[in-house]
């Protein structure tokens, strides 16, 4: 019915908008208490790193998942990795290409409860101009207006043209990367 009314109004030169969907409450991230980290593998060794600068726009309530949304923007130039040489290599064009692609963005407008507890955000991650679907699994505890969320996403870096496929000079970097996050936020307003 709403679609028919909008179509009729449009043909008559009038503008109309559909009723806005209800939004879950907004949360403001506490950057000092939040972390965004990753773990990859080089040969058989775990390589750990993270991003020092990221923001999150979050709307969430356990009883209003239909109105929930997440948007995370990551300053890719803020990447830190074990060993200073690795960080410089990772910023380069063959890997993250931070000069041309300084920001990565994750957006999700679909969040669902998972059997056994926790949540899954069905979102899209954009890195180096490539957009790929990425599910984000997380748990959240809300107490006295403060939310603490811990979760992960499992990525295949080569899906985003990040780094080579296979070994280079005898060094093999696994395509799988675990992204881990800890976000603390206070209820806005």
For the regions a protein language model found, what residue spans apply to each?
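Bacterial N-terminal signal peptides
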Residues: 2-15
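Low-complexity, acidic/polar, glycine-enriched regions of mature
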Residues: 19-189
């Amino acid at each position: 019915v709403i679609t028919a009314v909008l179509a009729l109004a449009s043909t008559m030169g009038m503008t109309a908008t559909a009723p806005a969907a209800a939004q879950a409450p907004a949360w403001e991230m506490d950057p000092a208490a939040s972390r965004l980290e990753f773990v990859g593998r080089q040969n058989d060794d775990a390589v750990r790193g993270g991003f020092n600068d990221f923001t999150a726009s979050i709307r969430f309530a356990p009883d209003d998942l239909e109105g929930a949304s997440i948007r995370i923007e990551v300053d890719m130039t803020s990447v830190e990795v074990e060993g200073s040489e690795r960080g410089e290599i990772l910023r380069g064009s063959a890997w993250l290409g931070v000069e041309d692609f300084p920001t990565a963005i994750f957006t999700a407008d679909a969040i669902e409860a998972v059997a056994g507890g926790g949540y899954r955000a069905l979102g899209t991650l954009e890195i180096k101009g490539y957009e790929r679907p990425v599910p984000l699994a997380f748990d959240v505890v809300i107490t006295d207006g403060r939310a603490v969320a811990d979760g992960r996403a499992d990525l295949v870096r080569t899906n985003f043209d990040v780094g080579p496929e296979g070994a280079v000079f005898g060094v093999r970097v696994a395509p799988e990367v675990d992204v881990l996050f800890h976000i603390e936020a206070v209820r806005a307003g």
